[in-house]
């Protein structure tokens, strides 16, 4: 393939190049059967500017001895060059920071490098200043240092995963999981989720209703139960008490934060007490507020967030309110800069069936009696299609920052990723391109009109807006933003160097629906695999199955238990020997919990995280009001979608979708 600046007679046609190596710069890829398309902003693995050394594995391909594979051993050479353990070749990375094609190197279970894999004995590295860079128009929209491209070595110790023609995302972070049954973990992995945060002890009434693992004894037992599963774990303790000692002992036992839930009590006094401990211990508070308004209204809860002039950060679960929270105006909290708002997936997006299924779900989850009028009035107060419609819009504006599942307690753990992209599709279909994507397209139009189109990295055939910014906004909702909210963004949540290689590969036609492979800590843990007795890997039944990273002792090495700062060292297993006066060992003790999975402290700056830190989802509406009689929602400062669509200050229309993508085309049931 040649560049416009260096035409050649042996030019490889774009379609042929995509067939051989996957799409490259300026090519577009449709996400499953949605209306969303992403466009590759830069190709660091080859493409128009550096074609000829693309790394491909297979018969007659490049990654072979004396060709693309170096002879350098894993320990490195005299020049300090050390081959990676695994290379993912030519993958289309979709992350909050961009849409690029690159080779990805993994070493010691972490992302070592993003850029160009090569053999230094036969290939020249790409100079740092010659890597193609995304062409951005928005102020501050730049690559983080940990996503900058570089060259890295493939050697005899390197495994190869073909990412060519496939999409690579970070593993999902689900912050609202009721730990009801072990099968949930398999469903999560099969959907591309690699970190689960929540609480529960099994199908007890307290766990089916609330995301809480209460007290030291239960916390220890649940950690023991989850030790052999290849997912990162964060447990939420019971925050519904004004007793600081009861809260602190749960932090010492290993919780990542607290859940205050109305079924246990969500009074202003409880919220204040829990936040005080959160501030002291540097953990997060997740809130399911008082739907019945028994102990106060929304203003009472909002006031409890503030102490000594500081607006303390709070992670609000299902901020729309159907999952719980002050009726009918819980959604107004998206206006607060200290509120980190999230949705749960049963209301995403608003369809003709959404309202109907919620009543039965609520009766089961919250232990209600359908024969008691007061119980049914409680259920009805939470189900408001008007606020669900506003939730659609607020997600597209970037005013609701996160998505989660509410697994088996009104939500589906295997559908968090899928519901996110269904929402994005609905909004694209309804309102057109985002203003940010329109802005990029406008720059291209100017370049074309002024005769610069041929020199511009995007030519006339791609002047129609892509959906890159919208896609980056939505992928951030279940990756980097929940990781930031719970202080684990230094380890997971994005495709950046230094982080755990918790990665998901997707075939574009199955994007967001059925993953191709899931890497957990650099090891393949889940994948689409056919009949184990077949002669090859693809014969039916072709299903998501656990592979070696999910078996034996592998999960103990490729996954973490996240705990509060300073707690990991107390819980990690250490062997202590007791000797007598003659130096003879008389006793061997194990300190900590004696578990094999490593406990890791979360970051210490978690209490300073605000909505302004939410990647591409930091929008604070000028105003948002819910009419207490009609439940209609009015949003000020609404700037989503096509610039010709005016919603600022207008009542949000109730728009029920009758058909969504990623549905019956992919599933029998």
Predicted regions and their residues:
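Divalent-metal coordination cores built from histidine and acidic residues
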Residues: 2-75, 130-169, 185-270, 275-278, ...
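Residue-level marker for buried hydrophobic side chains located in beta-strands
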Residues: 159, 171-173, 285, 403
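Glycine-rich, histidine-containing beta strand-loop boundary motifs that form or position
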Residues: 106-108, 115-116, 181-183, 191, ...
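Di-metal (Zn2+ and/or Mg2+/Mn2+) metal-binding site signature of metallo-dependent hydrolases
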Residues: 166-188, 630, 634-635
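Active-site core of metal-dependent hydrolases
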Residues: 257-471, 486, 528
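Active-site microenvironment of metallo-dependent hydrolases
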Residues: 1-144, 189, 194-195, 384-402, ...
């Amino acid at each position: 393939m040649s560049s416009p600046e260096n035409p050649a007679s042996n030019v490889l046609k774009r379609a042929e190049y995509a067939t051989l190596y996957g799409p490259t710069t300026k090519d577009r890829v449709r996400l499953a059967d949605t209306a969303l398309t992403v466009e590759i902003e830069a190709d660091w693995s080859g493409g128009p500017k550096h074609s000829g050394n693309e790394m491909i594995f297979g018969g007659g391909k490049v990654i072979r001895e004396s060709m693309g594979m170096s002879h350098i051993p894993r320990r490195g050479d005299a020049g300090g060059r050390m081959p990676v353990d695994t290379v993912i070749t030519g993958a289309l990375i979709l992350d909050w920071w961009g849409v690029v094609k690159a080779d990805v190197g993994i070493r010691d279970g972490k992302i070592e490098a993003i850029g160009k894999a090569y053999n230094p004995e036969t290939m020249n590295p790409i100079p740092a200043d010659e890597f193609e860079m995304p062409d951005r128009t928005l102020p501050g929209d730049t690559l983080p240092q940990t996503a900058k491209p570089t060259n890295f070595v493939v050697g005899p110790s390197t495994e190869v995963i073909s990412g060519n023609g496939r999409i690579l995302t970070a593993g999902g972070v689900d912050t609202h999981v009721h730990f009801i049954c072990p099968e949930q973990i398999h469903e999560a992995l099969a959907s591309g989720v690699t970190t689960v945060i929540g609480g529960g002890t099994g199908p007890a009434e307290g766990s089916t209703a609330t995301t809480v693992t209460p007290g030291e004894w239960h916390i220890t037992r649940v950690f023991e139960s989850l030790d052999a599963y290849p997912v990162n774990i964060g447990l939420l303790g019971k925050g519904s008490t004004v007793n600081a000692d009861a809260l602190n002992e749960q932090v010492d036992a290993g919780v990542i934060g607290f859940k205050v839930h109305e079924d246990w009590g969500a009074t202003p006094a409880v919220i204040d007490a829990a936040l005080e401990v959160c501030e002291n211990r540097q953990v997060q508070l997740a809130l399911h507020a008082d739907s019945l308004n028994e102990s106060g209204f929304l203003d009472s809860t909002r006031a409890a967030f503030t102490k000594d002039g500081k607006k303390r950060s709070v992670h609000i679960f299902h901020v729309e309110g159907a999952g719980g929270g002050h009726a009918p105006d819980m959604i107004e909290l998206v206006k607060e800069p200290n509120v980190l708002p999230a949705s749960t997936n049963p209301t995403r997006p608003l369809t003709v069936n959404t309202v109907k299924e919620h009543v039965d779900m609520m009766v089961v989850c919250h232990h209600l009696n359908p024969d008691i009028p007061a119980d049914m009035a409680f259920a009805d107060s939470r189900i408001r299609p008007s606020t669900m419609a506003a939730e659609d819009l607020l997600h597209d504006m970037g005013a609701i920052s996160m998505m989660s599942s509410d697994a088996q307690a009104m939500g589906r753990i295997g559908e968090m990723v899928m519901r996110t992209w269904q929402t994005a599709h609905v909004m694209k279909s309804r309102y057109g391109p985002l203003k940010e994507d329109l802005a990029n397209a406008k720059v291209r139009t100017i370049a074309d009109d002024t005769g610069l189109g041929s020199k511009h990295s995007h030519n006339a055939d791609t002047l129609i807006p892509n959906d890159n910014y919208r896609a980056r906004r939505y992928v951030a909702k279940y990756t980097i933003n929940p990781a930031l909210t719970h202080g684990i963004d230094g380890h997971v949540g994005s495709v950046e160097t230094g982080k755990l290689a918790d990665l998901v590969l997707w075939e574009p036609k199955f994007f967001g629906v059925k993953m191709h492979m899931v890497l957990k800590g650099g090891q393949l843990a889940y994948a689409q695999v056919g009949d184990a007795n077949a002669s090859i890997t693809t014969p039916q039944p072709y299903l998501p199955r656990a592979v070696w990273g999910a078996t034996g002792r592998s999960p103990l090495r490729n996954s973490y238990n996240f705990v509060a700062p300073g707690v990991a060292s107390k819980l990690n297993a250490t062997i202590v020997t007791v000797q007598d006066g003659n130096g003879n060992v008389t006793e061997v003790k194990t300190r900590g919990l004696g578990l094999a999975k490593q406990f890791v402290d979360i970051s210490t700056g978690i209490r300073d995280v605000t909505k302004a830190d939410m990647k591409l989802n930091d929008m604070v509406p000028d105003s948002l009001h819910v009419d207490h009689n009609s439940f209609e929602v009015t949003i000020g400062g609404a700037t989503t979608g096509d610039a010709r669509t005016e919603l600022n200050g207008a009542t949000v229309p109730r728009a029920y979708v009758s058909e969504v993508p990623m549905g019956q085309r992919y599933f029998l049931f």
